[in-house]
């Protein structure tokens, strides 16, 4: 079975997201934990969560993926911004325990001319202060495209962050196809080679989710602009190879393409028809 979903609005709660996922043929979804700008999160509606968990069990949902606000920067030069990122992420993880055994994804951040080494140290330090031994949520570092001073632009930087985290069992990676294509990893022509490199540097056992996006920009452009599946520089053939690859096909795939629900439904149908497992 292809485990696939897309980014959904959380404005009407978890049950609503689950129902919308089913309407478009998905068995998972991604959502923002709060406003993308990081404002106060809505109170947890325990009845809504209960109804969603029942729906998810009845329909064989795989793990869902919570996404931290884009504006968080755990390696900012401003100490207040770093503290804010830690505060929000810690609160998000506390709330995620209402939906146990799922995934939480965040962008590592930008070091803003402090240097990559400083950025890596701040990010790993933030994770060490946030992660708890008894948590059930796995925190995923997202692979980035390398625009500006982003940390996580290559596998080595992600690996170094993980190396410095104490509770490594609670940390994994979300691989974004648009991001790594734009960062200079040739998933179109050399997917096996890219995965071998990932495995040797980070370890495929640390790969827990994939953001499945085409790219509006050419290879190694360091731009990060998502395109609908098959209409960008990655293309449908390469995406088909990704979802069918024996080292990837078991993972949950999350579409973040520029679409409304109907567009996501069409993409999911297309990808299911291309899935050969």
UniProtKB/Swiss-Prot annotation:
Signal peptide bounds: none
Positions annotated to bind Zn(2+) 1: 67, 107, 142
CC cofactor note: Binds 3 Zn(2+) ions.
Gene Ontology biological-process entries: base-excision repair
MF term (GO), any: zinc ion binding
Matches recorded under InterPro entries: AP_endonuc_2 (IPR001719), AP_endonuc_F2_Zn_BS (IPR018246), Xyl_isomerase-like_sf (IPR036237), Xyl_isomerase-like_TIM-brl (IPR013022)
Keyword tags: DNA damage, DNA repair, Endonuclease, Hydrolase, Metal-binding, Nuclease, Zinc
Residues given in the record as Zn(2+) 2 binding sites: 142, 176, 211, 256
Cofactor (UniProt): Zn(2+)
EC number of this enzyme: 3.1.21.2
Catalytic activity: Endonucleolytic cleavage to 5'-phosphooligonucleotide end-products
Residue numbers binding Zn(2+) 3: 179, 224, 226
Similarity remark: Belongs to the AP endonuclease 2 family.
Task performed by this protein: Endonuclease IV plays a role in DNA repair. It cleaves phosphodiester bonds at apurinic or apyrimidinic (AP) sites, generating a 3'-hydroxyl group and a 5'-terminal sugar phosphate.
The protein, known as: Probable endonuclease 4
Source species of the chain: Clostridium botulinum (strain Eklund 17B / Type B)
